[in-house]
Amino acid sequence: MPTGAEIILPWWLFVLMLALAVLALLDRLFVPSVRWFWRRRINRVVDEIGQRLQIEIRPFQLTKRQVLIDRLVYDPKIIEDARKLAREKNEPLELVQAQVAKYAREIVPAFNAYIYFRIGYWIAKQVAHLLYDVRIGLAHKAALQSVPEDATVVFTMNHRSNMDYVLVAFLAAERTTLSYAVGEWARIWPLQTLIRAMGAFFVRRNSGNPLYRSVLERYVHMATHEGVCQAVFLEGGLSRDGRLRKPKLGFLDYMLRSFDPQRDRDVVFIPVGINYDRVIEDRSLLRSLDQGAEKRSLWFVVRTTVRFILKSFWLMLISRWQRFGYACVNFGEPVSVKDYCREHAIDFRRLPRPERFEAVAGLARVLMEDIRREVPVLPVPMLAAVFDAHPQSWMTATQIERRAVKLLNRIAARGANVYQPGRDRRPYYVAKALDLMCMRHFIEEQDGRYRLNPSVADIMRYYANSVVLASEGKGIKPETAAEKEPLDAPT
């Protein structure tokens, strides 16, 4: 080719070469600088937050995700289970190990402290305060502060709403980070990425796959052994009728089956009670109990949700938005597993499977009773209990208040931790709750008197059940004849 001859390239090839050159430049010059910038910023956030957290971020949470996946895949117990399964199914071990790796990638989170505290915390706080008047009701501060710094703290909670994840993560963020087990419903983009970055991990509810359960068990064991603070819904799912469900023992068993009370760090359970003046999913939860109800399509669910969101935004724009009342969380007294094992002469490691499950069930009963006592008694559920007890009666606000106070006193007398508002604040709480209930057509109002709307008696009982469970098992005594008041029909 003669010197100085022109070389003609197609435009598409020139653009492609230019793009590759730019990418190479970015990869060699800019990407390392950006990576260094973000790493320094994240480390600064971790150091800053670590100074104010009561329970510090564990090294396990800051370990690279791929390292944790490899630890899980090559865990001796999982390798043993994989070999056993390969022999039983007459499959190559490599095929079974590939399945193990898939499960490990599915389960292991990708905790990012910057996203957790700078993005996740901000979103949780804004959403919680947008929807509710958020309160921490009762907290045993001295007992909570006495928890050893190296202990594995596990918040055990009742599951009232999907808002529980947001509410507890936001309220506990001043003390620690939380790792949740989240159902497969949340495995959609971009929610899946955000949830993993927040330290949560996905689980397949009611999975009967022994290999999957083995991988999940070892991950829970690793996280517990390394001191990761966790949040567990012992019921294993949302309450459908407002009452506490029977506890699921799987996660407790995973945490405790290898627990050495002499050498391992202590595992401390903190009972948490959650309640709302309005549960966003209340009608859907009740509908799920109706076996004859027509199944709603995905399109119906999406359409209804979008309409609800748009209506809420419109009410905000015209300054007519009202929050859904109170959302309250009570933190109970910690339960030390080491102390529990010592008091009951239990070593979970040495028990055969049936006896171990019975011992785990005994601890679960203790925790559920503690949770039951901590469930907050809020204005709307309290008034719902009053209306549910007197479905045909027309009552004035004063009569409703008196009946609510009597019920509150009976619940408190049976050991439930309830907040007793001052006498001068009671009319305010009653009036606010009545407004919320009228707005949702739970009650009928006529000439300053109120009565239960018969068409929503099931929803009223759903809210009333959260009050009854505060002393469930001991029963709430009915009013005596002397306590009852004459209730006149409106004129």
Predicted regions and their residues:
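Membrane-interfacial terminal anchoring regions of lipid-handling membrane enzymes
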Residues: 1-231, 236-491
